[in-house]
Amino acid sequence: MGGRGLSHAEALWLGMIQGLTEFFPVSSSGHLVIFRSIFGIQGTGGLLFEVAVHVATLLAIAIYYRGRIASLVVGVLSRQPDALHYVGMLALGTLPAVLVGLSARGFIERQFENPAFTGFALLVTGGILWTTRRTAPRAREELSRGRPGVLDWRVALWVGCGQALAILPGISRSGTTVAVALALGLAPAAAAEFSFLLGIIAISGAAVLTFPDLAGASPQQISGLVYGSATALVAGLAALWAFVRMLEGGRFYLFAAYVWVVGSLFLLWTLLTGG
């Protein structure tokens, strides 16, 4: 992991961007690429810094859903069928991201240095979010009629495929997984919960894969990881609280306009500057 590493100010800004954008469906990874490209920040550690601040937002998820996580742990230990089923679906939903992450790590890392790819991916994210304009109201209507969607192996696997796609910068993990879950009939609150709990496993796995890279990191680079992660944790807690309430309000699809504008402007910037 070569390069000069991040200054404290750069790490704080990038950590804040990560924390604020991780839980809104606008692609935190895409915003990190945009910030680095426009402000000319180099030698940031690329995927390593990305995973470090993701671990911080993972802690935010664990804190926010601590009650649900505790009940699942107790349920699994006491072999309660509902808890065992839910954890099994989390494991199944994790498989696609594991397979993609292990088999295409080199390609994925290169895309973090490819601004044009990120701009295009943001446009794709906008299209995914726009589909919830119809699927979210339908899911809420089914819930009101006492017919909530069922979290079965098909739902878990398709949501997992959405998470695997979102490894790429510019594709929103929360946006894609929640959109897929809504399309398959899960209620908004259930879709958000499964999406974020699924993220705990995937992010933990990505962190483990990058731990060996820390051996070659300089003290300045390690310092940048610490500053960025701390900021991401605080910002992530605030953003997660706001996200859940906005999702329940049924305005999820409005984020599509934001990512379309940002993606288009960033693509234009890459064309004018050579990216």
Predicted regions and their residues:
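Multi-pass membrane proteins that catalyze or facilitate reactions on polyprenyl-/lipid-phosphate substrates
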Residues: M1-G275
